[in-house]
Amino acid sequence: MTVMKRQSTFRILFAMVLVAVIAGCETVPSSGPDVLVGQWTNSLGTVWTINPDGTFHVATTKPKAQIWGTYTVSGNTVTVQETRQSGKVPKNCKGPGVYKFSRPDANTLAFVLVNDVCKPRIQNVTQPWHRQ
């Protein structure tokens, strides 16, 4: 093989490796708190802002309410706990809710119920969420 052909082959190989490395860096993480952070909305019109400091704010339309709280993450499981609310919120929604989460793509967040007794929260959380 001539020197020119070798250089060309190495350049192509280097470019392919570089593309693979860059593509690997752009994948969406599948667990941990960073997966959840952002502002999300669902088909019910609920807006859920999840902050990196372990706090969140929810603005719901049905029932119309503002909810603030904290969350903890273990792997792909999140526990949410309301700390303050305004508007009509059922009494059984004062305890924690536990959900498994996944990121089907970069702009979608999905939850599956593990343990929760708050029906409005279950109805909202288990909807597909889209990054705002």
Describe the predicted segments one by one.
Residues M16-V19:
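Short, linear, compositionally biased motifs with a strong N-terminal bias
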Residues V3-F14:
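Bacterial N-terminal signal peptides that target proteins for export
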Residues V21-G24:
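C-terminal motif of bacterial Sec signal peptides marking the signal peptidase cleavage site
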